Structures are given as structure tokens and as C-alpha cells.
Amino acid sequence: MDRETFGRETGVSRETLDGFETWRALLVETNAHTNLVGRSTLDQFWARHAMDSYQLLEHVGADVTKIADLGAGAGFPGIALALGLRDRQQAAHVTLVDSVGKKVAFLRKTIAALALDADARSVRVETLDPAEGFDLITARAFAPLNKLLGYASPLLKNRAQGLFFKGQNYRDELTEARKHWTFDCEVIPSRTSDGVILRIHEVERAN
């Protein structure tokens, strides 16, 4: 997949497509000296990173106004969501969280370059305050589901939902997580890989 194919398949505006290209160029430039993503995956930016992340947008409700992306890394899916939300004229703020300072520096540079409604925080995810009232929690390649729910459960209150990317072994992760947690889960097949997206809510510690 290339830029033009991505543009056709998503239907985003030319301005938004330019934003994705700027993000890609910043990623290539920064990744030359700072390990943000595997270098071998940069040639697959449009399919493996951009489209994979962008597919999440169709599962983001129109009432969502505050999103937290845990373990944000190079911005997948947080930056893609911020670009997509602006493209569909939805006023929503994305908070990208990562404990690695160099990654957060890249995220802040990207947010500024694209003038996104977003912020990046160099903190551990467990320090996020549930009182901030996030509507949606996202994570991609961050932690096994059992551990991820430990981080996210305080934030998944008051009808908040999680959208978590998982690989082919997601059933094993669900089985392990259900030993420790009760939750509602919808399994959504990924459009770009053999993995899935898990929509999770109503999370509580198992008795």
C-alpha cells in the first residue's frame, strides 16, 4: 500500500493525507537515530502502521471527546486517531502516554507539526487520573491483556470503553485475563492483519 491507495481507501481529505505523510517523514527522520519502530517496518508504513491504526476510527463513537492511548510509542494508533477525528470534524482530545522520554519527544514534535488536538505525557500509565474522565482507552502492542486491564481498569469507569489491538493468540490472553477480571468483550476482526480489536468495558476484579 502507498500514500494514494491509503487516501482512496480511507476517503480522507488531501490535508489529512498530507498530515499522514508529514508524520511518516518525521518518523523516518527520527528513527534513523532513535529506535521508535522496527526499521524494516517503515517501508510498510501505510499498511502496517497507518491503515492498521486508522481502522480503529470506525469504532470510535460520535460522543467520544477524550481518548487516552497507552504505551503510545510512535503514535500508533493515537496520532492516526487524532488526524482522523479532525478529518471527520469531531472535537475530541487525544492524550498519548509513554514512559520513554525519547518517544514522547517525538510525539510532541509530531503533534506540534500537525497542530493536533492532542498532548503527549512522559509518565507511567498507572499514574493517569481517572477523574480526567476519558471516554476511550486505546493500546496497540503494549502489554498482555491481563496486565493491560490492570493499568486500564481505573480508567474504564462510567461507560468508558477500551479498544485494544491483539494478535492471533488473543483467545489465550482472554482466557488468562478472565481468571482475574470480569468484563464485557466484543471481538472485532482486524482489516489489516490476522489479529483482532477487542472492545472491552464493564471491567471489575474477579472475586
Swiss-Prot record:
Function field: Specifically methylates the N7 position of guanine in position 527 of 16S rRNA.
Main location as per UniProt: cytoplasm
An example molecular function term from Gene Ontology annotations: rRNA (guanine-N7-)-methyltransferase activity
Family according to the record: Belongs to the methyltransferase superfamily. RNA methyltransferase RsmG family.
HAMAP family: 16SrRNA_methyltr_G (MF_00074)
GO cellular component terms attached to this protein's record: cytosol
Gene that this sequence comes from: rsmG
Binding site residues for S-adenosyl-L-methionine: 71, 76, 125-126, 140
Protein name: Ribosomal RNA small subunit methyltransferase G
Catalysis performed (reactions): guanosine(527) in 16S rRNA + S-adenosyl-L-methionine = N(7)-methylguanosine(527) in 16S rRNA + S-adenosyl-L-homocysteine
Highest taxon in the source lineage: Bacteria
Compartments where located: Cytoplasm
UniProt organism field: Maricaulis maris (strain MCS10) (Caulobacter maris)
Keyword terms, alphabetized: Cytoplasm, Methyltransferase, rRNA processing, S-adenosyl-L-methionine, Transferase
Pfam families in the cross-refs: GidB
EC number(s) reported in the record: 2.1.1.170
